[in-house]
Amino acid sequence: MNEIQKYIAANEPQIMEDLFSLIRIPSISALPEHHDDMLACAERWAQLLLEAGVDEALVMPSQGNPIVFAQKIVDPDAKTVLVYAHYDVMPAEPLELWKSQPFEPEIRDGYIWARGADDDKGQSFIQVKAFEYLLKNGLLRNNVKFIFEGEEEIGSPSLEAFCEEHKELLKADVILVSDT
């Protein structure tokens, strides 16, 4: 077992609970009745990013749903990676097509089944955990910034204005897009 596998094995219960805590939030951007869920999901992401070791994690207003921004600056002269992801999900209907509740994660045949487990909470969660591993093991050589939006599933109507307004904050050498 290599060092990464050991880290995952040692932390698996907490890793799974943290991921499931995100998936359980029905952050459906297309439905206005989920406005509070959108904020709850953004706040949960900020908390998880802080726990992973970022210097700051902010839930920032936009013209629509909040945007989560976080960063870890290891060296002002180092290159910066900006990780983009989204925390909103599509509606789960029709519910009768689900074999389990869409916002109650279930493991079947080694896979997590739930709305958002893949697109995009699962993918972005893996990026954050990789960052955490690198940081905790003294392997992080680049600055890392995260931007997680809450409107990708409805066309990202607020993202362009947010990026324009905060272009200095979001400045990076490379962007890693975490989305299917």
Where are these regions (language model features)?
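Short alpha-helical patches at coil-to-helix transitions and adjacent helical residues
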Residues: A42, D120-S124, S156
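Structured loop/turn residues at beta-strand edges in well-structured enzyme cores
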Residues: E17, A52, L139-N142, L170
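Secondary-structure boundary motif
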Residues: A10, E51, K136-N137, E164-E168
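N-terminal helical capping/dimerization or prosegment-like subdomains
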Residues: N2-L95
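Predominant activation on well-ordered alpha-helical scaffold segments within soluble catalytic domains
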Residues: A46, F125-E132, E160-C163
